[in-house]
From Swiss-Prot:
Start and end residues of each UvrD-like helicase ATP-binding domain: 6-474
GO terms classed as biological process: double-strand break repair via homologous recombination
Lineage of the species this protein comes from: Bacteria, Bacillati, Bacillota, Clostridia, Eubacteriales
Name listed for the protein in its UniProt record: ATP-dependent helicase/nuclease subunit A
Family, per entry: Belongs to the helicase family. AddA subfamily.
Gene symbol of the encoding locus: addA
Domain UvrD-like helicase C-terminal: 512-811
Keyword annotations: ATP-binding, DNA damage, DNA repair, DNA-binding, Exonuclease, Helicase, Hydrolase, Isomerase, Nuclease, Nucleotide-binding
Domain of life of the organism encoding this protein: Bacteria
Quaternary structure (record): Heterodimer of AddA and AddB/RexB.
Protein source organism: Clostridium kluyveri (strain NBRC 12016)
Amino acid sequence: MINVNTKWTETQKSAIFTPNCNLLVAAGAGTGKTAVLVERILQKVINDSEEVDIDKLLVVTFTNAAASEMKERVGEALSKLLELNCTSKNLQRQLALLNQSNIMTIHSFCLKVIKNNFHRIDLDPNFRICDDTESKLLKQDALLELFEEKYEEENLGFLNLADGYGGKNDSKLQDIVLSLYEFSQGSPWPKRWLQDVLKDFNLGSDFDFGDTKWAKVLMHNVTVELKGCKNKMKNILNTIENIEGLEHYLEPFKSDIESIDKLINITTWDEIRDEFIKLSFNKLPSKRTDPLVKSYKDKARNTRDEVKKKLISIREDIILCTDDIYENFKEVYPLMKSLTFLVMDFYEKYHNKKSERNMIDFNDIEHFCLEILTSKDKNGDIIPSEAALEYREYFEEIFIDEYQDSNEVQEVIMNMISRKNIYANLFMVGDVKQSIYRFRQARPELFLEKYNSYDEKEGSKNRKIKLSENFRSRKEIIDAINYIFKQIMCREVGELDYGEEECLKSSARYEPFEGNCGGDVELHVVDKKENENKLEDENEEELLDAISVEARLVASKINELVNPSLDQYSFKVYDKEIDNYRSIMYKDIVILMRATQNWAPAFVEELNNSGIPVFADTSVGYFQAIEIKTIISLLQIIDNPLQDIPFIALLRSPIGGFSPEDLIDLRVVNREISFYEILKAIKEHSLELKYSLEHIDERLEYKVEQFFNKLCLWRRKVIHMPIDEFIWHIYIETGYYGFVGAMPGGIQRQANLRMLFERAKQYKNISYKGLFNFINFINKLKSSSTDMGNAKILGENENVVRIMSIHKSKGLEFPVIILSGAGKRFNLTDINKSVLFHKELGLGPEYVNSERHISYPTIVKQVLKRKLKMETLSEEMRILYVAFTRAKEKLIITGTVDNIENTFQRWCEAAYCEEDKLPEYSLINSRNFLDWIGPAVARHPCGEIIRKVCPFEYNLNLITGDDSKWKVFVYSKDNFKSTLDENIDEDIIGKIKSLELDNNKEIYKNEVYRRLNWTYKYEQSSKIAAKFSVSELKRRFKLIDTENGIEFMEPIYLKKPAFLRESKGLTPSERGIVMHLVMQHIDIDKVGSYEQIKEQVDKLVFREFITEAEAKSISVYKIIKFFNSEIGIRMKKSNNVYREVPFYMEIESTELYKQLPQHIYRDEKVLIQGIIDCYFEENNELILVDYKTDHVGDIDSIKEKYQVQIYYYGRALEKLTGKKVKKKYLYLFSKDYILDLS
């Protein structure tokens, strides 16, 4: 039975029910592909005719989040079906099997294959997986060892390679080796691929460049450029042929076009080479023309000169380069041989290092799996292994989500385990227009190959189904997406022709609304050019850079949407939860950028200056945070105190507390020795420096002694403590953790410190040990540009504008998208490296001659450079498509240009063509997103401003009859210079002075009374606390206000200080804190006996986590009983146990205060905070445990007392992890009792 609550389209039904074939579902953005995938899985397991158990289906995704979401959705659907048919044994069975189902990431599946078949390959079953950081460190170590060995061997091939490509310190060659190694891992058999690409350079005597794969690519590329030149000449010819006075230009231009046409129609390399050599250009006839047509004459001459320059460039840089190819290859071959051998040697060195540590990396997971699933036949061809055939027999159907992101290794794996011919069982779903992970070795060609070859007819064994009905975005956005991409996405740029069949169809349901909602797509273009008439004494701060200018534009646009002026209506968005329109909130707006580095900080600053709350999801900036720099400086001087820079940094920090004057006094003692040695001399009253120390007063001497003693103590302690515990000890002992919490942005700063602590905890598990190695580990992270980004502290419901990269937005949707930085140049730096790599075309090296100190690109590098540029631009095209399709209700595009007139002229020139598609040549030579969007909009009736600003008049063929609507705005940089505060003040004063009060003041009497008697509409809201702890909620739900059922902010009761208490022993609350601390730090692998636990408690005393008196309050027997209890045994069995986990969660105020009017307080939020004592994973679900140490009476009263607290813990945990909390327990230490509060 099909889900009766969902209205599936006919194509969706086909995707759900088509049986017994390899099925490719090309699902456009927002077309419900996940829903279709889930429904197909459901139909497989609930269909009586098939009777397939859910564990017999393999469903692979590319992220853990996607796998968890899919499993959850399948589980929810099965549960709902079971509610309707509660006696169904099959549904009960499928729900029971769900936890054993194979809905997982591709890496998880590969790992499962390895663990079940490790005996088939040379792998210890106790292996572990190293993380990216440890992998990078190991690679670096392996590479340095390898280079040292090669230098010691004095290997001539290696020495020549290092001379040619190594740079000053071999770093460039090391980068090439690492890059080529990583690139080769994208091949199913990396070593074979390296050997194959090396053969390309070992030319035979019968070598003919025209027969090579490189010549074919180059011919195609040259043809595209020739068509671009022809198009330019045709356009200018069309412009001048009806202009009187330029008749003498017509014949030369026609002749040039004929010559280019002849080159375009040539099909062989030798012929095109000969024609280019013969190519010549006639001189244009000279004739005096009327001044009125001079601009057209100049334009014609300039265009022809530009085309001539391009054709000569093709001849000199490409065509004639092939003459030296044979000689070049003879010299390059030994170098490439040395390089490929060096990479294979690195492979062995790195592999051995991993084997020594009994670990594998993420690339190994796929390659070991492939090794298990493949074997060779007598001819050496790859066939499925015995293990692969077992999986092929076991899995009834294989589902691949996001198929467009598959790589070649994954493709072979899936081919090995999927059935063939009449039993074909492969279901692939994705959208090649959203393939944006080529930099991770994704191969969109795999999708395209099937997309172009599979049949749409029913009954085909290789069938294709297209889903094009978009259920996400308003029609205005869908129309704009189709309008732009029909013009710009083609086989050359985008790798797919975006035609009518690829167009999205608007199917989203948005109720009609008369207010301010939806609307035209907006394009905002800012001219970066400075105003030539600006004043010489203009404030330098007002000379804004381009990023800040654009950020101010965006800030003004956001304020216009969220905080409209009195004469404007508030912008409304449709909220599915309330099934109605509501006013837009900051959280409805997302600013997307191609890359956030350098851009996000400027946007955050400008938006904050405009009073807009904003959060930037960046992957940089962590190591530059002052709190992280301070702690790292402290660790550096604990390891080696003779380093002056970190030492001074620490002395000046709040941990040291030394002033600049103090540092000057210390340096004067002796300028030749380190600061550490100076402090040591002061502490020990050194006789050698007796006279130099006379100016050190008692205050500074005391300060020095205190700091020096602490430093010595830390240096002793770090030897005996794990690095993570030592870092936390530093935080608490110095009070630095609390200090940064009181600074501006304190929550973020504390989160950053916790992140460093967690990083240290992870480091503890890797093969490198000790403080020195940890510092080295951090330094390598910084030097390798592996900045981690600030710790994430915001939940998804925080009311802030978000800034994120387009890549991070993939798979998400937002009411309002502002695509910023559309004028930022494409990053093409990778295609300029000294050696280029390509899967099909192999290696593209520079020709280098160390003796003559010359280098230049070989013809092969030229080919690879052009091919990689095309692939990069195609990726950028798909990234733009992803950005556009994130928007649900409003799309705004912003960008800056260097010179508005020149830019608009370039756009109009690119748009000056007869076809609907923009010329490939123009698309290839575009510099940024605006260069694609601008020409398309210039041909739209709404793009009139672009055509008007353009200094040269083009008679563009407008695309009429298109449903899309655009608003184009053009600004000068001067529009965004902020008004100085004093000018604002003067304006206000002037307005006040201009007021003329009527002598009859009685007319103001009523207004005065009205204002004095005014009452605040939201008075109750002002009494509601903005933040609660979960413990406060527990008390709050026990109290009832007799008047209105609402309890507002409570009075504050201060605890009696210790010196006023009669008893100096620990209070019950303090004993509880100590027990929680022990339970947080105890090693659960060492809790089998009294002695083991007692030893751990003693260690906490030694490390100063607790005092002797606090340790005596701990009942070791109570802890033993806990770990011998049912819940304790389950916890010990779990691989993932988390303790003392802080959280923040936003809830609606009306949830706590039931009597508040819903229509007024619906958007009022309250922040809930708390710390979860413990939770652990069990069968991919969570078990929550909360300890209680206080004495309890009746169990039922305890249950009632803590029910609310545990409810919010569970709710927060599910939100925090995205996983289901299966059970919630209270453990009562006073009764050794487990209380189930699920």
